[in-house]
Structure formats: C-alpha cells, structure tokens
UniProtKB/Swiss-Prot annotation:
PANTHER family: TRIFUNCTIONAL PURINE BIOSYNTHETIC PROTEIN ADENOSINE-3, TRIFUNCTIONAL PURINE BIOSYNTHETIC PROTEIN ADENOSINE-3-RELATED. Keywords: ATP-binding, Cytoplasm, Ligase, Nucleotide-binding, Purine biosynthesis. GO terms for biological process: 'de novo' IMP biosynthetic process; adenine biosynthetic process. Pathway: Purine metabolism; IMP biosynthesis via de novo pathway; 5-amino-1-(5-phospho-D-ribosyl)imidazole from N(2)-formyl-N(1)-(5-phospho-D-ribosyl)glycinamide: step 2/2. HAMAP family: AIRS (MF_00741). Belongs to the AIR synthase family. This is Phosphoribosylformylglycinamidine cyclo-ligase. It is found in: Cytoplasm. It catalyses: 2-formamido-N(1)-(5-O-phospho-beta-D-ribosyl)acetamidine + ATP = 5-amino-1-(5-phospho-beta-D-ribosyl)imidazole + ADP + phosphate + H(+). It comes from Shewanella halifaxensis (strain HAW-EB4).
Amino acid sequence: MSTPTTPLSYKDAGVDIDAGNALVNNIKSAVKRTRRPEVMGNLGGFGALCELPTKYKHPVLVSGTDGVGTKLRLAIDFKKHDNVGIDLVAMCSNDLIVSGAEPLFFLDYYATGKLDVEVATAVVKGIAEGCVQSGCALIGGETAEMPGMYEGDDYDLAGFCVGVVEKEEIIDGTKVQDGDALIALASSGPHSNGFSLIRKVLEVSKADPELELAGKPLIDHLLEPTKIYVKSLLKLLEQHDVHAMSHITGGGFWENIPRVLPEDCKAVVNSDSWQWPVVFNWLMENGNISEFEMYRTFNCGVGMVIALPADKVDSALALLKTEGENAWLIGNIAKRNGEEEQVEIL
C-alpha cells in the first residue's frame, strides 16, 4: 500500500465542482423564464416547492417521465445540442396533456462522464425553452458527472413532469364511441422515436447526412425538435368535449391509439387525408421499410390524434388552426367486432 505524494482532490478523480457551479450560473436566466406563480423558493434548494393552482376544486396530479432515446446519439455526433432539451420536455408534457392535465413543473437529469459546461448549458437552455412552450416551471434537476460511466463526450438525459387536472375533467377514453371523429395534429418530424432504426438506415444506406431534402439537410429534418401541443390542446379543452387523445410516440399508430380506446371501438384512419413529410418517404425508401413497420415505428407526420364528437369537427379545426396547428380530419371511430385490430389504416 502506497500513499500519494501529493494530496488528491475530487477534481483529480474527474469531478469538477467548479464546472457544475459555472453551469448553474449559466442557466439561471433561462430557468427564471419558466417560473410560475405557484413555485416557492429559488433554484438550488434540496427540494423544490410548488403549490397547487387555486383554480382547481378537486385537483388530481398527473406525472410522467421519459427520455430522448438514441436521438441523443445523432445530436452528440453532429454537435447539435440546442434542441434535445425541447425534445425532453415535449415527450413528457405531451403525455400529460393526453389526460387533460396542465403541466405544472419539470425536473431534469443530465448525466455525463466529464461535464462540458458549454454543451450542458445548451441542453438545459433547450429544456427551459421546452418548459416555456409547455407552460411549466423548471424547478430543479440533477447534473451528474460520473467518470468511468460514460465514454468521451457522451451524455444522457431524463425528464420528469407533473401536471394537474380537475378530477371531473380527466380524459381517459371512456367517452369514446362509434361515430366519433378523429383529428390529427401534424408532427414536426420523427420527434424522438424510432431513432435506432433511423441510425440503422443511415448506416446501411451510407447516406450523406447533409443531403438536401425539401430545402434543408437530412440531419436537420431528423433533429427537428419535437412539437409541443400543450397550449393548443388546453385551449381546445376549454371549448370542446374531447373524448380521447393519443400521443403518437414509440409504437406508432398501431400501439398508441389503442391505449385510449374502449375494447369495443376501433380507429379507422384514412391514409389519403395527408401526405407523409419527405423525411419519412426517404427513410422508407432507403431502409426498404414496409408500410406496416413505418406505422409501427414512426409518427409518419402525425404527432397527436384527437377523438371528439363528429359535429364538433369544424369548430375544433378552426380553433386549432387559430392556435397555429396544422390539423385535419384523419378518420373516425367505428364499432369493433370480435378480435379485430383496434386500428385500421385504409
């Protein structure tokens, strides 16, 4: 057993506390933009405090956690860190709004082998921007510098969001019925799902990521941040009786739409009602991917599907378009017979 000739520090072991403090200083103004009146105290406490909004009579908390998946691999490889924070918030807050919940607060977890303050600042500023878009407060998080756990510049992200909904207004799909209409909200791209397959397509096709598609590089199509639908849908919920909403994420149409349908109902989707964004056609062609697999892996241009009474379609579409959404009638709910699949794409 030998004793070091010079004293060891945490920094010698690979953990730079000063870098962590520099990151906190860098993000303070961005985090401040997300503040809600219910938040108590400031960033940096042992626990973050948040009151329930007083407008709720019987508030129910709704929680969700998610990550960005292997989209991070592309972001790291191409040094495009600004938008993955938006993706992180979107994946959580879009899941909450499906229940009718207003996102209240968000916490993030950023883990890396060696903290790069510039990269981490870009990521957290993106998280703050996502919180602004969702209307929730970034009230805390964890930055974990863990030498030996991650290689090189790699890092990982996870997010946790809590929202609130009036107990009597929870949307759980039980009101969905035969004859309901289905409205689609356009996605901004692949969002944050299917990236292991996307990376495989890039590998086998040997495609140039800078290849121009519809006026911008392929890599920009792929890394376009996930669309956040929260504020538009909260407006819709104020004025319309929405029966169900489905966030089209991993598992695509086949897996996500049935999650909000009663057993005796199926969704009939009219594939002629929209054109896939060019990036999905490129993936299908260059990966030789079947149409079934495309609908099972990707959103194919549809980020959210909404079920509501058929006589409310026109007013709902008008409202959503006023809120800046590209929305259209994509199909309807029909009676399901026996063991039929719960999604039928025509």
